């Protein structure tokens, strides 16, 4: 975790991990408290969604029958006093994605302004893990 000692980075990372929590994903109010009013996302599916569409999609998911989403390789950089960029990987029941998030500080705290997910497959044994 890069820059993990900084309060802005810690707040963004903590909030990102909250978004992966099944309880938070089921609650309109909790999701709303973490998403910027102008939030945009390019999801793993390739669809572009705004704040309302993300809240509707996440709260409609049945997360009780599946494993929790796991995050790994999270790194963070504070780009400006009010902007933090996170990158990490997730495993959502075998669906892998590289993720990138921009968190903005507002009067309401650190809110997710932009998010993008890109699907990937885990390299097999003997396959190169380097990307050029």
Residue ranges and their predicted role:
Residues 2-33, 40-132:
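A beta-strand edge to alpha-helix "cap/lid" segment located at domain peripheries
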């Amino acid at each position: 975790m890069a820059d993990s000692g900084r309060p802005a980075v810690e707040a963004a990372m903590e909030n990102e991990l909250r978004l992966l929590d099944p309880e938070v994903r089921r609650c309109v109010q909790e999701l709303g408290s973490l998403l910027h009013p102008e939030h945009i996302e390019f999801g793993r599916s390739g669809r572009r969604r705004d704040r309302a569409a993300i809240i509707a999609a996440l709260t409609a998911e049945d997360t009780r029958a599946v494993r929790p989403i796991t995050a790994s390789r999270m790194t963070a950089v504070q780009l400006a006093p009010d902007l933090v960029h996170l990158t990490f990987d997730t495993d959502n029941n075998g669906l892998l994605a590289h993720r990138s998030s921009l968190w903005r500080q507002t009067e309401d705290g650190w809110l997710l302004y932009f998010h993008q997910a890109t699907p990937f497959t885990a390299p097999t044994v003997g396959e190169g893990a380097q990307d050029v």
